[in-house]
């Protein structure tokens, strides 16, 4: 567990700040602030067990849900993404995008994104390393899926990379990773 606020950067200009976990009658949620430069955003992905919300503070948010046309949100507008809905977002404006938001329930989103951003930053390519992606996306497959990764990669390449990565010590950094949340 981190001390809050907990700030992470992915090396491409995207900055997430985890503000803490808020408990209320509807359940726990992780509160987050987001900063992203123009044209930066998340690839198409799905949170299997979480609802997510983003409120635009400054800039222009681009959002596309699975099978839908892109839409946009401007300052003061909130977008709520139901669990299980594939989506991607990006800064669709010409200035920095600033959003506040939450993920409910928190599950392992903070750990997952911290490890993913660290891998992206270390790699310097805007993408996580192959071994890190194989480990994180396999471990937390009950919680999140990156929809742009072909099924053949998940079913053929990841199973080859996992034991190889273990032999090479690539996953030592994940030894204290929390257990994945399984659907109830």
PLM features: what roles do these ranges have?
Residues 54:
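Structured binding elements
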Residues 1-29, 41-50, 63-184:
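Jelly-roll (double-stranded beta-helix
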Residues 31-35:
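Short amphipathic
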Residues 57-58:
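A cytosolic small-molecule/anion-sensing beta-strand core signal
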């Amino acid at each position: 567990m981190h001390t809050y606020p907990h700030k992470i950067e992915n090396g491409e200009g995207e900055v997430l700040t985890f503000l803490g976990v808020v408990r209320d009658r509807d359940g726990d949620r992780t509160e987050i602030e987001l900063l992203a430069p123009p044209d930066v955003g998340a690839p198409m992905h799905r949170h299997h067990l979480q609802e997510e919300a983003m409120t635009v503070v400054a800039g222009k948010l681009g959002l596309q849900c699975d099978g839908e046309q892109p839409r946009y949100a401007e300052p003061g507008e909130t977008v709520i993404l139901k669990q299980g809905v594939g989506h991607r977002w990006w800064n669709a404006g010409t200035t920095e995008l600033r959003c506040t938001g939450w993920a409910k329930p928190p599950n392992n989103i903070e750990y997952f994104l911290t490890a993913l951003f660290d891998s992206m930053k270390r790699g310097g390519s805007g993408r996580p390393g192959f071994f890190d992606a194989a480990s994180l996306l396999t471990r937390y497959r009950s919680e999140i899926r990156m929809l742009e990764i072909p099924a053949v990669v998940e079913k053929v390449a990841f199973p080859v990379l996992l034991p190889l990565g273990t032999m090479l010590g690539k996953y030592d950094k994940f030894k204290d990773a929390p257990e994945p949340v399984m659907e109830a």
